[in-house]
């Protein structure tokens, strides 16, 4: 029996760190294969998937800036790191027979298309995975904000934030064993409780555009499929 799909078009935010696996930095082969396999499963179900990937496994602009590097320069270096991750994801998808396209917010014509909204939407409608690289193309904006922006531009049904924990908790579950996971929470409640779902700019954009967010753990087998079919997975942040 075909499973009912709750979200037809999604924007998946992947952190660069989620590609490291147990390695201290870089891209872990087994981890990227597992992650792409999870995404490929929902693509085959007919879900249209756009991805914004971070670059923290290779370079973190904020950390470099703290070490006296010019912040704008550091952020541009971070954007380059996201392009490297995007190319790795594209290669992994194509190994599985899933068509994927990389669109970069910075012009790099030899290795990626320059971001163009109509073309990206066309690719999604054709069943291709679209990987958005280089953040927003501007310094001082996080990849969370890029994900919110692309999610709004692509008219996505939901933004899915893949993290290393399986949702939003009352406290850090790694530090507080009594922390409990929220199944659902409103944007206003998350603000009131000062829950760090994502950075303030991204959160405000999602709230304004009424783009709901699901925070979930991508490393948990089958978690993405459960999210897109509307099962109780992760935390739904809603209007």
From Swiss-Prot:
Subcellular location: Cytoplasm
Cited CDD domains: AAK_UMPK-PyrH-Ec
InterPro entries assigned: AceGlu_kinase-like_sf, Asp/Glu/Uridylate_kinase, Uridylate_kinase, Uridylate_kinase_bac
Annotated ATP binding sites: 13-16, 56, 60, 163-164, 169, 172
Enzyme superclass (EC): transferase
GO biological process, one term: 'de novo' CTP biosynthetic process
Pathway: Pyrimidine metabolism; CTP biosynthesis via de novo pathway; UDP from UMP (UMPK route): step 1/1
The keyword Nucleotide-binding is assigned to this record: yes
Stated regulation of activity: Inhibited by UTP.
Residues bound to UMP: 55, 75, 136-143
UniProt function note: Catalyzes the reversible phosphorylation of UMP to UDP.
Name this protein carries in UniProt: Uridylate kinase
Organism per entry: Neisseria meningitidis serogroup C / serotype 2a (strain ATCC 700532 / DSM 15464 / FAM18)
Lineage: Bacteria, Pseudomonadati, Pseudomonadota, Betaproteobacteria, Neisseriales
């Amino acid at each position: 029996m075909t499973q009912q799909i709750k979200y037809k078009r999604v924007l998946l935010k992947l952190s660069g760190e989620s590609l490291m696996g147990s390695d201290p930095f870089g891209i872990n082969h087994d981890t990227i294969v597992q992650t792409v396999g999870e995404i490929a499963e929902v693509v085959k179900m007919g879900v249209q998937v756009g991805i914004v990937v971070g670059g923290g496994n290779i370079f973190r602009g904020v950390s470099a800036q703290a070490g006296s590097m010019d912040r704008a320069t550091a952020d541009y270096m971070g954007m380059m790191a996201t392009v490297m991750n995007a190319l790795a994801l594209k290669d992994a998808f194509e190994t599985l027979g899933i068509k994927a396209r990389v669109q970069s917010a910075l012009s790099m014509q030899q290795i990626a298309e320059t971001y163009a909204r109509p073309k990206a939407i066309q690719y999604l409608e054709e069943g291709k995975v679209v990987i958005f690289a280089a953040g927003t193309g501007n310094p001082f904006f996080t990849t969370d904000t890029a994900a919110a922006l692309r999610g709004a531009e692509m008219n996505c049904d939901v933004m899915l934030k893949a993290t290393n924990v399986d949702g939003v908790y009352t406290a850090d579950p790694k530090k507080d064993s009594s922390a409990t996971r929220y199944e659902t929470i409103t944007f206003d409640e998350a603000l009131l409780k000062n829950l760090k779902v994502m950075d303030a700019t991204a959160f405000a954009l999602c709230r304004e555009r009424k783009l709901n967010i699901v925070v979930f753990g991508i490393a948990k087998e089958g978690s993405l499929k459960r999210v897109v079919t509307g099962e109780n997975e992760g935390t739904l942040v809603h209007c």
